[in-house]
């Protein structure tokens, strides 16, 4: 692992409470299963499961859930030198409704939760400087002091020549308003080297038809090396300054879509960490995205995010069985 490039993931990790029966509302559910969640943490775990090297930077409540989550990171091989604890705030919780098609709705308990209270002075900047890729979302932009810490972490990475990877991961209930969400998510848009958005997020951010190239291309900026749009089981689209195209997905029986996007991102970042030239080589890029599509698909076949994250063998098995 000595020569394996480090990918640092920044943001939130929380407990998801998932109904033990899918297709029922939170009120109707008779029981809940607790599962670790939070997109940046899922990405960090996806990376190590696929043989990469990752670290997580974030803040937890000094409570049983917080220590449980950090132990899960450690058990998954994620470097936890960037985590800290808050004695005065709780670890965030989310109640997740699983609809019949495996899609989700969220109800959050975090006012404020420890992850929102991360201060710039608590950042492990040395860890960020060691990374090849620095990955983050937008939830850490919602409130202070975490927003300032997030901006400082990005600047540290950029100044050190680290690639910036952004998955906005829109969670509208956490923002004060729709307008605040769009403004906040776009406030750091032009800093990223790589951005991954879902088709729904394209529609949300542009108010346009996500299927149309000109709508997607309105999200490109001068410094952006790659824009990826995920289209669920249909696969994904990619846009660079030189080329654009689509990579088909893998049809599987989806049980729970939680973590599928994070599994996709983790898989792509592992490929990019190994070979930066994939941003300029369309053939290599398509291979990396096909592998990422397979990882995302495998993740939907089991409940929970981190427990469902695939190994390379899981993804390759699916790719072989569905080779077109």
Swiss-Prot record:
Q: Which cysteines are joined by disulfide bonds?
A: none
- In terms of superkingdom, the source organism counts as Eukaryota
A Gene Ontology biological process term: starch biosynthetic process
Catalysed reaction equations from the record: D-fructose + ATP = D-fructose 6-phosphate + ADP + H(+)
Is Transferase included in the keywords of this UniProt record? yes
Q: List, alphabetically, the Pfam families matched.
A: PfkB (PF00294)
| EC class of the enzyme, as a word | transferase
Give one GO term, molecular function aspect. ATP binding
Which pathway is this protein assigned to? Glycan biosynthesis; starch biosynthesis
State the GO CC annotations: cytosol
State if Ligase is listed as a keyword. no
The catalytic activity of this protein is classed by the Enzyme Commission as: 2.7.1.4
Instruction: Give UniProt keywords alphabetically.
Output: ATP-binding, Carbohydrate metabolism, Kinase, Nucleotide-binding, Transferase
Which InterPro entries is this protein grouped with?
Carboh/pur_kinase_PfkB_CS, PfkB_Carbo_kinase, PfkB_dom, Ribo/fructo_kinase, Ribokinase-like
Record family assignment: Belongs to the carbohydrate kinase PfkB family.
Q: What does this gene product do?
A: May play an important role in maintaining the flux of carbon towards starch formation.
Q: Per its record, how is this protein called by name?
A: Probable fructokinase-5
